[in-house]
UniProtKB/Swiss-Prot annotation:
HAMAP family: Ribosomal_uL11 (MF_00736). Forms part of the ribosomal stalk which helps the ribosome interact with GTP-bound translation factors. One of its GO terms (molecular function) is structural constituent of ribosome. The keyword Plastid does not apply. Belongs to the universal ribosomal protein uL11 family. The gene is rplK. This is Large ribosomal subunit protein uL11. GO terms for cellular component: cytosolic large ribosomal subunit. InterPro entries: Ribosomal_uL11, Ribosomal_uL11_bac-typ, Ribosomal_uL11_C, Ribosomal_uL11_C_sf, Ribosomal_uL11_CS, Ribosomal_uL11_N, Ribosomal_uL11_N_sf. One of its GO terms (biological process) is translation. Pfam families: Ribosomal_L11, Ribosomal_L11_N. Keywords: Methylation, Ribonucleoprotein, Ribosomal protein, RNA-binding, rRNA-binding. Part of the ribosomal stalk of the 50S ribosomal subunit. Interacts with L10 and the large rRNA to form the base of the stalk. L10 forms an elongated spine to which L12 dimers bind in a sequential fashion forming a multimeric L10(L12)X complex. One or more lysine residues are methylated.
Length: 141
């Protein structure tokens, strides 16, 4: 028989840098998860993606065991890395802060494809371009 799910916790944690300190520790402690067990496993699984913000969905079962799924980094994080900026524009319609090429957008769309609700890469590219425009980026090409 399948285990009963007690809780689902969604967090965004820097890859390879999960620690028992806030905000990770309290969120996991409330759910009844072994914090050290989770942080060690998460850091081992994301060690190759250092510096990225990784969304994680943790499923906690009634016997206090857990599973977790790591997702691809948010599109905004990938766009900022591709453009080489730290922040998007506060006024995206008037202040353009960076430029990204169609090739960069395609690369990001291919990376994000498994997490996006898109039929093909072109649809995923349109989603990523929309995110870029809403951040004050210009899409060239």
């Amino acid at each position: 028989m399948a285990k009963k799910v007690a809780n689902v916790v969604k967090l965004q944690i820097p890859a390879g840098a999960a620690t028992p300190a806030p905000p990770v520790g309290p969120a996991l402690g409330q759910a009844g998860i072994n914090i050290m067990g989770f942080t060690k496993e998460f850091n081992a699984r994301t060690a190759d993606q250092k510096g990225m913000l990784i969304p994680v969905v943790i499923t906690v079962y009634e016997d206090r065991s857990f599973d977790f799924i790591t997702k691809t980094p948010p599109a905004a994080v990938l766009l900022k890395k591709a453009a080489g900026v730290e922040h998007g524009s506060g006024e995206p319609n008037t202040n353009k802060v960076a430029t990204v090429t169609k090739d960069q957008v395609k690369e990001i769309a291919e990376t994000k494809m498994q997490d996006l609700n898109a039929a093909d890469v072109e649809a995923a590219m349109r989603m990523i371009e929309g995110t870029a425009r809403s951040m004050g980026f210009v899409v060239e090409g």
